[in-house]
């Protein structure tokens, strides 16, 4: 059983995958998307689901600090619902507040250059989201 973790942004989707035991999350890739053109990366996500034999997807839900859901959160919920319908898989939402900041701190502490951080931040945020989910199940 593998679980895919997604950090959905306006221009990219960070992707992470669990190990087969469901204990650890590893970054896979960053998928470029274009919301305005209706390009959400579903084809690539579908390929990854098949390639890694995924049976659950965790999508980060960006909440405001007071717990409310704003426009970005609503867009992520719609993204998750579209995935659920398209792939016929269990898709769960996971509170991702501060996941990008946590990923940034991780990369800084690992002495990753600013240029490289920019390239991998979404993938690392997906790792933080998925690892949070795995740690709590």
From Swiss-Prot:
Main localization, broad class: cytoplasm
A GO CC term attached to the entry: cytosol
GO molecular function annotations of the record: nuclease activity
GO terms for biological process, alphabetical: rRNA 5'-end processing
Cell location: Cytoplasm
Keyword Hydrolase in annotation: yes
Keywords: Cytoplasm, Hydrolase, Nuclease, Ribosome biogenesis
Xref: InterPro entries: RNaseH-like_sf (IPR012337), YqgF (IPR005227), YqgF/RNaseH-like_dom (IPR006641), YqgF/RNaseH-like_dom_sf (IPR037027)
Pfam families membership: RuvX (PF03652)
SUPFAM superfamilies: Ribonuclease H-like
Entry-linked SMART domains: YqgFc
EC number(s) reported in the record: 3.1.-.-
Signal sequence annotation: none
Family statement: Belongs to the YqgF nuclease family.
Cited function: Could be a nuclease involved in processing of the 5'-end of pre-16S rRNA.
Listed PANTHER family: POLYNUCLEOTIDYL TRANSFERASE, RIBONUCLEASE H-LIKE SUPERFAMILY PROTEIN
Entry protein name: Putative pre-16S rRNA nuclease
């Amino acid at each position: 059983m593998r679980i895919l973790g997604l950090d959905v942004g306006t221009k990219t989707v960070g992707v992470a995958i669990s190990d087969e035991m469901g204990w650890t999350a590893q970054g896979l890739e960053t998928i470029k998307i274009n919301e305005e053109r209706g390009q959400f990366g579903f084809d690539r996500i579908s390929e990854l689901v098949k390639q890694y034999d995924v049976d659950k997807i965790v999508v980060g839900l960006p909440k405001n600090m007071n717990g409310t859901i704003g426009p970005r959160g609503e867009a992520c919920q719609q993204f998750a619902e579209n995935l659920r319908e398209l792939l016929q898989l269990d898709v769960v939402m996971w509170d991702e507040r501060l996941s990008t900041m946590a990923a940034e701190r991780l990369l800084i502490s690992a002495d990753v250059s600013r240029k490289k951080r920019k390239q991998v931040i979404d993938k690392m945020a997906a790792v933080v989201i998925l690892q949070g989910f795995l740690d709590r199940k």
